């Protein structure tokens, strides 16, 4: 039985970039990695209402740069930048080095798999039927220009005694094509019956278009 690899991880270094960019020796590596995980967990909890999709961390010699990708930058920045200044101080104290925090707005949150997954999870927590939530997310994503989307939900759906997996797909989602720009997101819906996992794959198109060579004319071949 085949298992699906993480679409982002398998494309790292090809068409996807790492979420943490730094170099460390064997002693510092686990410290930096653990620190990155804690920083992301802290920011996700702090900005849970800001629709944060991903957090990029760049470590330099004596400081760090953090980029927050969010669909609601106003909540992150706050009035006159007060919230982001407080956030910068907290993260700097957390990491032990000066930190520069920047915010990038996600123009089309319907094309972001992580935000779509979190949106479906929030609807499931509000006791909305899972099929209705899935179809609504699929329609919104295809409307803004996606070439394909697949949504999978797993758990005690609608309070059933036996957990099961249901999925819905429209368009193309070529998981085996490395040049395919596939965004992947995962979220959990905490319901009274248990936790329901939500996975989303969004196909945005191919990064490298195939090269079409023009056929040689007869005169050029003879020459």
From Swiss-Prot:
Keyword entries, A-Z: Ribonucleoprotein, Ribosomal protein, RNA-binding, rRNA-binding
Function of the protein: Binds the lower part of the 30S subunit head. Binds mRNA in the 70S ribosome, positioning it for translation.
Gene3D superfamilies recorded: 3.30.300.20, Ribosomal protein S3, C-terminal domain
Pfam families linked to this entry: KH_2 (PF07650), Ribosomal_S3_C (PF00189)
Organism domain of life: Bacteria
Organism expressing this protein natively: Methylococcus capsulatus (strain ATCC 33009 / NCIMB 11132 / Bath)
Name of the protein: Small ribosomal subunit protein uS3
Disulfide topology: none
SMART domains, sorted: KH (SM00322)
KH type-2 domain mapped to chain residues: 39-107
Classification lineage: Bacteria, Pseudomonadati, Pseudomonadota, Gammaproteobacteria, Methylococcales
Family annotation (PROSITE patterns): KH_TYPE_2 (PS50823), RIBOSOMAL_S3 (PS00548)
Entry's Gene Ontology molecular function annotations: mRNA binding; rRNA binding; structural constituent of ribosome
Family assignment from sequence similarity: Belongs to the universal ribosomal protein uS3 family.
Quaternary structure and interacting proteins, as annotated: Part of the 30S ribosomal subunit. Forms a tight complex with proteins S10 and S14.
InterPro entries given in the database record: KH_dom, KH_dom-like_a/b, KH_dom_type_2, KH_sf_prok-type, Ribosomal_S3_C_sf, Ribosomal_uS3_bac-typ, Ribosomal_uS3_C, Ribosomal_uS3_CS
Any Gene Ontology biological process: translation
GO cellular component: cytosolic small ribosomal subunit
